[in-house]
């Protein structure tokens, strides 16, 4: 028995929700360890569609314990709204099966306002954020001025912490020419939301440690993708947290030895939302076709995703930076019917071949992909549930990906339905 960490191996939107839900049946606990309510994911269970943003995917299964770890930035109003929405769909959620780290950093309205102000100030400097306050909240966390969940339970010290926070933010707001935040009004809002979120607060690191010692299976659910990691991604076009697998330890308070098997999720092609380098992007009718077939629009924002061929170099890089043991390859069915399929096997930078994406923003923009052409397949892979259901060329495509990225495929997904999954190796039994 082992615990499992799930991370996106590309730029997010890889289909983690379905895979986490598929794995959650075997887990006792599902825990989010980074990001915020910018990480939309969709679950389709028994014909019912659930759209999540902040809550762990395991929350739709009331028998599982779902946890939001300290590495997450937590919007209390978004939390309350999402819980209410799921309850309206018949999902049983309460403090008995959902816990939130008491030391989690809060996202406040002032964070969302600052995020939006920056993003809309100039198209030239836009990063492509969701404008939900994620980055500014992480800034306050690192700047040691953040309001944390447990602060809401301490009315004696909260006013001082709010004043410290507003000393910083009101200076920024004056510089931008917008109204300052009134400390009294903010304290009133926090007092109103406190009783709706504090019942979920817990010492998560301690809870998880006890559960691990009891032999419970823990599933760590990553958000976004490793290529959006603030250190290892395509900086500055990244998110504001670490998204690689190692963050599962830091973002929950567990030691690295508790993590176990690392499963990387990647599409059979590549997508990206927002700005930033994308070596294999297709700006032609093929890219449009992939986007239409794959329904490549953001769950939270509705933003159209950029589409391109599978980039084996980027996934291989993620396999190394996240220590991935096996891949879950999703949306293979979207490539059905193509005469040929291109796979990026390397890069050319200023006339020289290189085997990884350089760290510099300028170099990333100049990179040219080197492609290998693979014969496509006509027989549909949609809804396949075993290797025997797949056409020979589709199997060859999967095997070639394994060779190029240096990692085996543990799971293969052929539709949004959780049952349409081909299991090669069970991560919990690896």
Curated annotation (Swiss-Prot):
Binding residues annotated for Mg(2+), in chain numbering: 13, 40
Highest rank taxon of the organism: Bacteria
Cellular localization per UniProt: Cytoplasm
Residues given in the record as IMP binding sites: 13-16, 38-41, 130, 144, 224, 239, 303
Top-level enzyme category: ligase
Textual note on the cofactor: Binds 1 Mg(2+) ion per subunit.
Catalytic activity: IMP + L-aspartate + GTP = N(6)-(1,2-dicarboxyethyl)-AMP + GDP + phosphate + 2 H(+)
Subunit and interaction comment: Homodimer.
Name of the protein this chain belongs to: Adenylosuccinate synthetase
The organism of origin for this protein: Nitrobacter hamburgensis (strain DSM 10229 / NCIMB 13809 / X14)
């Amino acid at each position: 028995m082992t615990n499992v960490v799930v991370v996106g191996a590309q730029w997010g939107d890889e289909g983690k929700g379905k895979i986490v839900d598929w794995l959650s049946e075997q887990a006792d606990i599902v825990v989010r360890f980074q990001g915020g309510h910018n990480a939309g994911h969709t679950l389709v269970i028994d014909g019912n569609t659930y759209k999540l943003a902040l809550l762990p995917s395991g929350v739709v299964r009331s028998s599982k314990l779902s946890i939001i770890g300290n590495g997450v930035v937590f919007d209390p109003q978004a939390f309350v709204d999402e819980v209410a929405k799921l309850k309206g769909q018949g999902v049983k959620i309460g403090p008995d099966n959902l816990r939130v780290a008491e030391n989690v950093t809060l996202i406040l309205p002032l964070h969302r306002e600052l995020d939006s102000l920056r993003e809309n100030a100039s198209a030239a400097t836009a990063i492509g954020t969701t404008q939900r306050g994620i980055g500014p909240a992480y800034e306050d966390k690192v700047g040691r001025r953040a309001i944390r969940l447990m602060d809401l339970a301490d009315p004696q010290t909260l006013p001082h912490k709010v004043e410290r926070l507003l000393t910083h933010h009101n200076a920024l707001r004056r510089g931008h020419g917008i109204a300052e935040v009134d400390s009294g009004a903010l304290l009133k809002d926090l007092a109103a939301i406190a009783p709706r979120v504090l019942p979920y607060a817990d010492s998560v690191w301690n809870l998880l440690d006890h559960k691990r010692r009891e032999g419970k299976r823990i599933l760590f659910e990553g958000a976004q993708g490793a290529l959006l990691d603030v250190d290892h991604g395509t900086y500055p076009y990244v998110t504001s947290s670490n998204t690689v697998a190692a963050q599962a330890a830091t973002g929950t308070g567990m030691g690295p030895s508790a993590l176990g098997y690392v499963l990387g999720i990647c599409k059979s092609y590549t997508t990206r939302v927002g700005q930033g380098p994308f070596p294999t992007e297709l700006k032609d009718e093929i890219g449009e076709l992939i986007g239409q077939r794959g329904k490549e629009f953001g769950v939270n924002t509705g933003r159209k995703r950029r589409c391109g061929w599978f980039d084996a170099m980027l996934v291989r890089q993620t396999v190394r930076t996240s220590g991935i043991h096996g891949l879950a390859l999703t949306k293979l069915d979207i490539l059905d019917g193509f005469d040929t399929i291109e796979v990026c096997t390397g890069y050319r930078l200023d006339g020289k071949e290189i085997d990884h994406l350089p760290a510099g923003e300028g170099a990333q923009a100049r990179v040219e992909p080197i492609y290998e052409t693979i014969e496509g397949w006509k027989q549909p892979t949609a809804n396949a549930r075993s290797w025997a259901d797949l056409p020979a060329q589709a199997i060859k495509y999967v095997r070639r990906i394994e060779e190029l990225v240096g990692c085996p495929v543990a799971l293969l997904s052929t539709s949004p339905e959780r049952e349409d999954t081909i299991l090669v190796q069970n991560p919990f039994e690896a």
